[in-house]
From Swiss-Prot:
PANTHER family: PHOSPHORIBOSYLFORMYLGLYCINAMIDINE SYNTHASE (PTHR10099:SF1). It comes from Pasteurella multocida (strain Pm70). ATP binds at residues 307-318, 678, 888. The gene is purL. CDD domains: GATase1_FGAR_AT, PurL_repeat1, PurL_repeat2. This is Phosphoribosylformylglycinamidine synthase. Disulfide bonds: none annotated. InterPro entries: Class_I_gatase-like, FGAR-AT_N, FGAR-AT_PurM_N-like, PurL_large, PurL_linker, PurM-like_C_dom, PurM-like_C_sf, PurM-like_N_sf. Residues 305-324 are annotated as: Disordered. It catalyses: N(2)-formyl-N(1)-(5-phospho-beta-D-ribosyl)glycinamide + L-glutamine + ATP + H2O = 2-formamido-N(1)-(5-O-phospho-beta-D-ribosyl)acetamidine + L-glutamate + ADP + phosphate + H(+). In the N-terminal section; belongs to the FGAMS family. Mg(2+) binds at residues 679, 718, 722, 886.
Amino acid sequence: MLQIFRGSPALSEFRLNQLAVRFQKANLPVSACYAEYIHFADLSDRLTEEETAKLDQLLHYGPTLAGHDPVGHCFIVIPRIGTISSWSSKATDIAHNCGLNKVNRLERGLAFYFEFDRTLSSEEQQRLVSHIHDRMLEGIIHTPEEAKVLFDQQAPKPFTTVDILSGGRQALENANVELGLALAEDEIDYLVENFTALGRNPNDIELYMFAQANSEHCRHKIFNADWIIDGEKQEKSLFKMIKNTFEKTPDHVLSAYKDNAAVMEGSKVGRFFPDQDGQYRYHNEDAHILMKVETHNHPTAISPFPGAATGSGGEIRDEGATGRGAKPKAGLVGFSVSNLVIPGFEQPWENPVSKPNRIASALDIMIEGPLGGAAFNNEFGRPALLGYFRTYEEKVNSFAGEEVRGYHKPIMLAGGIGNIRAEHVQKGEIPVGAKLIVLGGPAMNIGLGGGAASSMASGKSKEDLDFASVQRDNPEMERRCQEVIDRCWQLGEDNPILFIHDVGAGGLSNAMPELVHDGGRGGKFELRKILSDERGMSPLEIWCNESQERYVLAVAPEKLELFTALCERERAPFAVIGEATEQEHLTLHDDHFDNNPIDLPMNVLLGKTPKMTRDVKSKTVEGSALDHSQIDLKEAFHRVLRLPVVAEKTFLITIGDRSVTGMVARDQMVGPWQIPVADCAVTTASLDSYHGEAMSMGERAPVALLDFAASARLAVAESITNIAATNIGDIKRIKLSANWMSAAGHEGEDAGLYQAVKAVGEELCPQLGLTIPVGKDSMSMKTTWHENGEQKTVTAPLSLVISAFARVEDVRKTVTPQLRTDKGHSRLLLIDLGEGKNRLGATALAQVYKQLGDKPADVVNVESLKNFFNAMQALVAEQKLLAYHDRSDGGLIATLAEMAFAGNCGLSIHISALGDNDLAVLFNEELGAVIQVRESDLSYVRDVLSQHGLIHLTKELGEVTTEDRIEISRGTKLLFSQKRSELRGIWAELTHQMQRLRDNPECADQEFAAKKDPENKGFSAHLTYDINEDIAAPYIATGKKPRIAILREQGVNSHYEMAAAFDRAGFEAIDVHMSDLHNARYRLKDFNALVACGGFSYGDVLGAGGGWAKSILFNPMLRDQFSEFFANPNTLTLGVCNGCQMVSNLAEIIPGTDAWPRFVRNKSERFEARAALVRINETNSLWFQGMAGSHMPIAVSHGEGRVEFKHDQQLQMLKDQNLIVAQYIDNNLNPTEIYPANPNGSVEGITALSNQDGRVAIMMPHPERVFRTVSNSWHPEDWSEDGAWMRLFRNARVVLE
């Protein structure tokens, strides 16, 4: 039965205003609009009054429900029929954990009420609906009762067969089109031959499974193909040339080409995690480094948010499923799209081609896609520390003549690093009888055919098949699964996982055969054992769907009980669906129909399918030199600063958590003004060392329109000039991931791809000593469609994205682009690896003037590049560089401007020594870097450059000033002069425009004003206590350790760093999951202190922290336990971020909290990840003793941190009772409500509160993520190991003595 509950208002005033503007532009006669959430409960039986009240309370979150009955025409947006939203999965979990067991499922809709000036036509209705829902993910109904269709269960469907025995090849050709299999001609022949030999017809599920497992996406046929170019047979395949890098330089690589990610040697450090007794401890061992970079281009083109989200999720699973289980650590992301054409901010180089209806626009992709990728990383608990963003769309004369080149099919790149134990690097053996398990969420009828669909050029598959290949994300589920994997690898030799793969393209139809095949086994499977949320699915849909957040594992039968216990504790769903067999044969039995939908020898599925041969011709291109006769230097610089590849990208950065783990040593934001210009990302290898890992990226795709090989060489070289800013040592420590995107089959592109791979794999990388142990290819980067009877095509340039990964010796030595004005006299030097060639082909300058040019930059001298890296490493190690920034997109002028922005300083630059042509000198994108050197170190630095054969490439540029002005001169002639603050504003315009479209425009305007303010003083810190004094030391010396419960719920992700901070303060930190309290494995009375940790409990679906709190309040046993703990005067409680929200929701059982507010959505309506300044007030909080009067930065990472009071008197009560412990302050040190100094809009900057007796504290920012100095994005140079926030944890230790 269905019960309906009204929810809170769903759209704020500014969101409704944005909608009104869109309706006006679309000429829709909407006079009024209101929207609220509506909840649908599918019940097994009628609820009692008490149960109804409980469920009603549970579904009360967000702003208070409007007191009126809405009027107007009702349009209710619901999840697409036949799918289950991730909101539903998590909300239903909460209901069950609150004892509401009659609830089969909860689902949520968004009810719009419109008033119209006149009756809408059906065409206008369609247009209206397109503005309020995503047809890929959602549907529309008009009455709440119609939502019953969401819960309808169908009878199971049987498989179908394709009659090739009588219908022959034609029958299979028809099935190929109808099922969207993307089978090649020779594969059709192969299947007809093999099934004829087996004497039976194939089932649809078998064909589908074959198509997924053998798609270009999964099998990389082009990279494994034989090649004939211009009639000449080539010696090696593309993949062999990539593998050549490993053959030439195998140093430090532990696993390559055979697993979900590659592994290289890491550092020996203290890895921090709980032992089987629950206590967190350091474990001194090798933390080897794994690396992986994936693309998710096709799903992102179709539906950007879930496409990018599941792209990140799939890559995270690849890392976790490496070896016998590993831990993902930090992520990177990248986007290439066509021109944005922002309304009201159109640029002179943008004259967009139209696009097919089935794909999203570039602007929509860049609004929704990054939010999807960030949301997944945030909720999973992985910091996103690195990225690139390029736009390109231009009619150019390239290898195939004049045509439109661009990214209508976007690149969405997701990658990262993780750590793995030495004994788990290699996968184990799969014994006969091993249990074959699916870990993770249920099968759903979504994401069908992603592998095959992404292998087709966009436009070749039917639109409804594109529709079917969109996936759905549930990162909180993936976090639960990862916690299980963590518990397994933490057992060391007792790890129950023998073999593990993630479930990606093709679903179980690809993952399970791969698992058993890689283990040299076959498998017997039971279809109906697979967890499924939809009874009516056919065998094909159950086996082949791409439901996310799943892994397949082999576990020895004797370890099954242990594995089961670990899953139950983490509330991670799993199912034993089969056993490994001696015979390499795959059988899938269906208990419902008592038949075998699959019954195939493994060698038919994964055997020697026909090998591809590419017989292609190479092409040449004659570009025309850049015409710069009409180009004005100032205008050119302004245009380049607005080009997305150069422009400030804060809008892509602050949406992503960059502090979770407590091990981030270098994120994108640099210096006291937090400017996003870091060259590389750096993490510490553990919470107790300065060893670490670094990541950087390189890509120069437009260059491939003139020279394929040069583009590939530059991508590799740029990744090296970026990562050179940190302390690596030997260049052989750097390992690369190569992601190749190409429009295979497009004129000239195949031969060009071969040239590019050869340039990198056979030549440049071996010469530099670099290895490419991992990578990915996407070979269908072309979009075709028909418009007004005419075929249109947009083809991407050959795009190689290189991601570089390396072990770091000492993360503290990383150099940033921030120019320093506080270090005495200094000089700026350019190391010009372009050797004065100053080529302008395919540069940002060319692009903003709608040109391509002729000669692009290239690697001029490989030996100089290697020497450059070695010289920078010597200078970084000796700490002789004040600042470093490589030359890249936008050229030298952009490099210098970014350094000045980071240093909030001026420049006086002289370019006479760099060449005769001003534009070529300033805008060429040849390799190189600018360094800032103290005057007193100049001769030492010149000596090092001389020893490395670089002094002839080193040019003095001028000096740094304290003025608000950037000046560039040639001799006595002033070429350029403008205020730095004005240029800073131009550079920030892109972010401002994107934030205004996507977020609260008022917040966007406030941030834009702050960026342009020449008086902005940047961050500072002042402590009223000695940062180096360990006030807990005398108590630790007694050997006594108070016990603290490091409390987490499903979806919490900040518990490791929290435990580490308390461990350092002398506590016995115990890992306590809410399931432990439910099942009485622990009781709170056995602890002296309790900390509720940050993250996304239940994915924040019923209000941040709300579901977690209500699972306590609505459970009598837990309610009593927490009430007793809070009432005990000898205990301490801390709630941070999600824990803060949760504890605030428990105020009714915490003494002295009557004045506490609750925490609601940020004013910006966006997840905010920033460093922010806070001031500590004088209160009686035991947690903040001795800290009053201090101000310092802290990590902020939340979407719902704004305080909301029940009534106006509450704020005054807080002040009267003196419970406001900390406030956000601006750079002038005043409490503020201005964004982004106050990232959530809380009144008076309130961000931390105490209860009346000082024992309980709640705070939204994260002290545990910055308890070490090294993990602060910015900090004063005189801070040593302990950060300013370590005092809070030591205060707690002193109190509990």
